[in-house]
Amino acid sequence: MAKGLIGKKVGMSQIFDEQGNIIPVTVLEVGPCAVSQVKSVENDGYEAIQLAFQDIKEIQTSKAEKNHLAKAGLGPKKVLKEFRSFGDSPTAGSVLKIQDVFAVSDVVKVTGVSKGRGYQGVVKRHGHAGGPGAHGSRFHRHPGSMGANSTPSRVFKGVKLPGRTGSQKTTVRNLKVVRINEEKNLLFVSGAVPGTANTVITIEKI
């Protein structure tokens, strides 16, 4: 069985526990995912399951990917991801649903692409303190001294500078599954998840 599934982010909400405490949750639409390939130690050197998610038009995929999916009896899919397997492996062409992999109280990690923030300065990008806020300062959100004196006479590699922020692959760990809606394939996890609504994400048990 696969250790995770593919899905997409729906948005954030909140639910109440038995004591009446508010729990902020992220709603994820997970699966159903079709098994496009089963890898074994004999053929591939390791055990894994490749899953396919979300139907697309035939023109949106390559010929190689189309033929690869056709071997499992599947049509064109938007996302292919590989997960390490444990226990009995399903057959190619079968479908894994949310209840096959996850249960309430499972601890998971979620990987997705974070929100893009565009070109940002060091205060927003790296959390620098900036300069004094007084009127006479003229130095509020600048990066400050970074090149030292005439001995290096340059800025070292790796210095935190302004630049494009976000839109990077990000993983959030130790999220707890608090609710599952099997009819609508919805998974409710405590806390925040990278990306905007409809961002494709992978959920994997830790």
Curated annotation (Swiss-Prot):
Q: Where is this region: Disordered?
A: 126-155
Keywords associated with the record: Ribonucleoprotein, Ribosomal protein, RNA-binding, rRNA-binding
By its UniProt entry, which Pfam families does this protein fall under? Ribosomal_L3 (PF00297)
Q: Which SUPFAM superfamilies match?
A: Translation proteins
This protein's source sits in the domain of life called Bacteria
Query: What InterPro entries does this protein's entry cite?
Result: Ribosomal_uL3, Ribosomal_uL3_bac/org-type, Transl_B-barrel_sf
Task: Name a GO molecular-function annotation.
Answer: rRNA binding
* Example GO biological process: translation
Gene Ontology terms: cellular component: cytosolic large ribosomal subunit
NCBIfam families assigned to the protein according to its UniProt record, in alphabetical order: L3_bact
| Protein task | One of the primary rRNA binding proteins, it binds directly near the 3'-end of the 23S rRNA, where it nucleates assembly of the 50S subunit.
HAMAP family given for it? Ribosomal_uL3_B
Family to which the UniProt record says this protein belongs: Belongs to the universal ribosomal protein uL3 family.
What does the annotation say about its assembly with partners?
Answer: Part of the 50S ribosomal subunit. Forms a cluster with proteins L14 and L19.
Tell me the protein's name: Large ribosomal subunit protein uL3
Point out the gene that encodes the protein: rplC
